């Protein structure tokens, strides 16, 4: 369950922490902290988008937030590509790293925006329960193709926030962003 207010008080009470004491690395984190939670501006944006989506009566109204969300996702992927790099792609030694000149603050900014996207997806899924509306372009933005980098990052974020599912090895350390998702010698299309 996501927090309903913008305050950072007792945020860990609603979140599963999978880090098991494993330290974060410069390029990724195994636990979320106050640097990753929504800023008041992002919380307001989340509330407005969820409200518009929840109150929509048809697909045209559902698409009202599509342009803004599409730009946000595009900016998020641009940020990911400018902050991080993948080395030894298509090998068993694939690793992710911060690009030269990038800082932990840049990493945290990406994770915060990713947390916004995860939160929006969860809230929209909650608002869709019991509705017969067809999935629209907004929902499709929030559910990227399984071979994409964004899918891997959202999957890892979900595991940190909600707890791991069966598609994760229980002994794996979950890291956000998941820079090596679908980048090794074995890939899915």
From Swiss-Prot:
InterPro entries per UniProt: NleF, NleF_sf
GO CC terms of this entry: extracellular region; host cell cytoplasm
Region annotated Interaction with host caspases, chain positions: 186-189
Location of the protein in the cell: Secreted; Host cytoplasm
One Pfam family cited in the UniProt record for this chain: NleF_casp_inhib
MF terms in GO: peptidase inhibitor activity
Known outcome of mutating residue 186 to A: Abolishes interaction with CASP4 and CASP8. Strongly reduces CASP9 binding. Reduces inhibition of host cell apoptosis
Function: Effector protein that alters host cell physiology and promotes bacterial survival in host tissues. Inhibits the catalytic activity of human CASP4, CASP8 and CASP9, and thereby inhibits apoptosis of infected host cells.
Subunit structure and binding partners: Monomer. Interacts (via C-terminus) with human CASP4, CASP8 and CASP9.
Protein name: Effector protein NleF
């Amino acid at each position: 369950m996501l927090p309903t207010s913008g305050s950072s008080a007792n945020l860990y009470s609603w979140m599963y922490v999978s880090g098991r004491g494993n330290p974060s690395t410069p390029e990724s984190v195994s636990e979320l902290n106050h640097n990753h939670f929504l800023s008041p501006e992002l919380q307001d944006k989340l509330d407005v988008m969820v409200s518009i989506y929840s109150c929509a009566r048809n697909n045209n109204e559902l698409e009202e937030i599509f342009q803004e969300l599409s730009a946000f996702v595009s900016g998020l992927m641009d940020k990911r590509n400018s902050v991080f790099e993948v080395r030894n792609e298509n090998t068993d030694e694939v690793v992710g790293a911060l690009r030269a000149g990038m800082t932990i603050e840049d990493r945290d900014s990406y994770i915060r925006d990713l947390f916004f996207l995860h939160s929006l997806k969860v809230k929209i899924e909650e608002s869709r329960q019991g509705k017969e509306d067809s999935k629209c372009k907004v929902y499709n933005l929030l559910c990227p193709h399984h071979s994409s980098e964004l899918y891997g990052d959202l999957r890892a974020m979900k595991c940190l926030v909600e707890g791991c599912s069966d598609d994760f090895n229980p002994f794996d350390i979950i890291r956000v962003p998941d820079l090596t998702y679908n980048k090794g010698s074995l890939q899915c299309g």
